[in-house]
Amino acid sequence: MFQNRAQAAIILAQRLKSLKINNGIVMAIPRGGVPIGSIIAQQLDLPLDLVMSKKLGHPGNPEFAIGSVTLDDLVLDGDAARLPQAFISAEVKKIREDISKRYNRFTKGRKSPSLEGKDVIVVDDGLATGNTMFASIESLRKQHPNSIIVAVPVSSTAAAQKVKAVADQFICLEVPKIFYGVGQFYDDFAEVPDKMVIGLLATANHNPVSHHGYTL
């Protein structure tokens, strides 16, 4: 159990310091991964950016994920095979437009950095299905990084197995046998507002702005 994202991030940062990271960058999955990524980037003196991904929901139940979409990749579950291709194509198009707008809003239009040859640390506040992280890694691979290191406080067993298979290194503080949801393992699992993401990202990249009253 973690007190909050900040406590988990400090522990992760200590684990990451033992690695030989060359020309590194921290890529956080918004929104919950950003407070964690911000602290790790600060502790390791690395830049911080975002990797954008969003679940693809089932038409009969949008909360039920049938895949994950990034700006340039798509990972589908087996349930998606029974759905019309036209539905999937239309939804993917809408999702990509949405996450592109969100990225520009979060970064204030700043161009995304090159990842070629870099050691990329991908962070989130936890893994439930692992689909979002899996899709993020597949997308990041296309930018030819030197390595991809996944760092998360907690993961389900299934998600850990899925992500380990595609990451170069997998650092996870807890992989409990009984897992109902990521929030189960935090005393404080408050929602991370958009304006906090914007503030943390700007501050991490040496463009100081207010955190709007929020504390890590």
Sequence positions of predicted segments:
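PRPP-associated nucleotide enzymes
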Residues: 1-216
